[in-house]
């Protein structure tokens, strides 16, 4: 059992907690959020506009958050170094504020007693890991690691499967991405990203993303071969990647479908899923996989040039991988003790 603390009880913090409750190897024992009081935590965890009402019990009692009859200590510190993670053996911390995303900033949790920090976002300097792609590079000596982004978690497994089988010369990615918390409901100021300041409810908004380039950090043989952009769209959850790649080895689309299907049933089971159904985005709300390959949606120009389509629940699927990485890190760390 891994005792876990969560810093930041926003979208990902809460969905990580919901996923953790489904994982018998994880016990969330503490939450820190300076902007949410205990009573409001109960409300926010109980009701969710995307994933529905929490089906278990949640209440505030004795200054703690009680979920499924188990107590969760609540802190309200702004500085990670002030959070007393070590007081009750909370060895692992999920850093989900979106603020402390560098090693230096995330290391503040170590001063409070945490032994390891998993950042639920891309990081400029922390080692990034994607389930199914580069766990062989994990070193228990790392004190801060990153689970990369939701889009990288979707893209990397698929590109690895294709690259290992056929070789990728180069590729371009577009992610048609659901709304996130940083966007605005009406036009407002956004000095660094003017288009990002436009209303999300009635616009398709082009945006930058580092997700494709980040694949090169996770899979070094693809470094410099992929880049991409994002379109923010007015849907509340589930995103889809449109990946166009030029292949070294010629392959029919049927060959590619077979390769991905075999991967989804083998080494990538639970990470990649395969569907030939006539699906749309809402069909994947609450889906646990990192990548859902849409076999009916892809197209091919010639044996070396193909467009592949993969869906992902950018909240639920990503949070499931945060939990998986937590368990993996804890198990590897235990072997070194």
Curated annotation (Swiss-Prot):
EC number: 1.2.1.12
SMART domains noted in UniProt: Gp_dh_N
Cross-referenced CDD domains: GAPDH_I_C, GAPDH_I_N
InterPro entries in UniProt: GlycerAld/Erythrose_P_DH, GlycerAld_3-P_DH_AS, GlycerAld_3-P_DH_cat, GlycerAld_3-P_DH_NAD(P)-bd, Glyceraldehyde-3-P_DH_1, NAD(P)-bd_dom_sf
GO terms (BP aspect): glucose metabolic process; glycolytic process
SS bond list: none
Catalytic residue positions: 150 (nucleophile)
Residues that, per the record, bind D-glyceraldehyde 3-phosphate: 149-151, 180, 209-210, 232
Keyword check for Transferase: no
NCBIfam families: GAPDH-I
Protein name in the entry: Glyceraldehyde-3-phosphate dehydrogenase
Organism: Lyophyllum shimeji
Gene: GPD
